[in-house]
């Protein structure tokens, strides 16, 4: 976890916590968090992907922690007078540091939220759950669903199925892996690339590909399907499972 040690002259000088600061009036919490990380730690924010937001409401003002992960190692170093040093700290070692009181009070909730969530979508099953004429043009129907999921990936979700052991996060930004099979594999992806959406075109059985992903994908996994046999295979692999209705209600 990337942490900064505050300069001695600042509030709680010498304490450790995540980079951050005040949000400008025109900024979202995401823009503010990434800007502060860049200004204080020289972090290349183009290399990280946001996966959640956790709020701490103090009645009159709110502290929001934006959670993000980097798919590859990235460098960071102190570039602000407010920062004495920065370090990548193993999660198990965080509690041993002298932490900023606000961060220390949130650490248990933050630690539970560090693991990103991947939603694995059985597109054939979801597509078959809504009667929009998909049987006349499977590739076209798959394209419509992909476009809608891309929007959802960008806006995030505020509710997860009860089957997911979720932390107290205000908004999740999962990774989506959408599995296509058969005629649906001809569907084109969204016109605008979305870093949280990946299309997996199954070479063989779509169910086999979904079960493989459920077992091999790191972090929390949520499989969206109503297929009983596939649900059992995914649950046996350690993934959570929900039916298509959860996803369709969000689109």
Describe the role of every protein-language-model region.
Residues 1, 9-10, 24, 69-74, ...:
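Short, charged/polar surface micro-motifs in flexible loops or helix N-caps
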Residues 1-18, 45, 49:
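N-terminal strand-loop-strand
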Residues 6-7, 92, 124, 183:
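Anionic group-transfer/hydrolysis microenvironments
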Residues 8, 55-58, 77-80, 168, ...:
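Short secondary-structure boundary/capping segments
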Residues 16-26, 134:
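Short histidine-centered catalytic/ligand-binding loop motif
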Residues 22-115:
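Unchanged
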Residues 116, 121, 127-251:
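Nuclease catalytic cores that cleave nucleic-acid phosphodiester bonds
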């Amino acid at each position: 976890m990337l942490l900064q040690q505050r300069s001695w002259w600042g509030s709680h000088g010498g304490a450790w916590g995540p980079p951050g600061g005040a949000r400008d009036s025109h900024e979202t919490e995401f823009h503010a968090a990434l800007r502060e990380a860049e200004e204080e730690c020289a972090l290349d924010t183009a290399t990280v992907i946001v996966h959640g937001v956790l709020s701490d409401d103090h009645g009159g003002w709110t502290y929001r922690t934006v959670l993000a992960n980097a798919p590859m190692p990235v460098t960071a170093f102190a570039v602000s007078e407010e920062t004495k040093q920065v370090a990548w700290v193993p999660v198990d070692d965080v509690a041993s540091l002298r932490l900023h009181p606000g961060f220390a009070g949130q650490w248990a909730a933050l630690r539970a939220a560090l693991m990103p969530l991947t939603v694995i979508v059985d597109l054939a099953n979801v597509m078959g759950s809504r009667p929009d004429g998909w049987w006349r043009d499977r590739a076209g129907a798959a394209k419509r669903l992909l476009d809608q999921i891309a929007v959802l990936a960008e806006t995030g979700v505020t509710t997860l199925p009860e089957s997911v052991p979720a932390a107290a996060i205000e908004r999740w930004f999962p990774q989506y892996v959408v599995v296509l099979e058969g005629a649906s594999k001809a569907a084109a992806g969204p016109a605008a690339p979305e870093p949280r959406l990946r299309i997996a075109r199954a070479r063989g059985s779509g169910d086999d590909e979904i079960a493989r992903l459920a077992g091999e994908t790191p972090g929390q996994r949520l499989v969206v399907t109503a297929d009983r046999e596939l649900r059992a295979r995914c649950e046996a692999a350690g993934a959570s499972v929900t039916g298509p209705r959860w996803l369709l209600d969000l689109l």
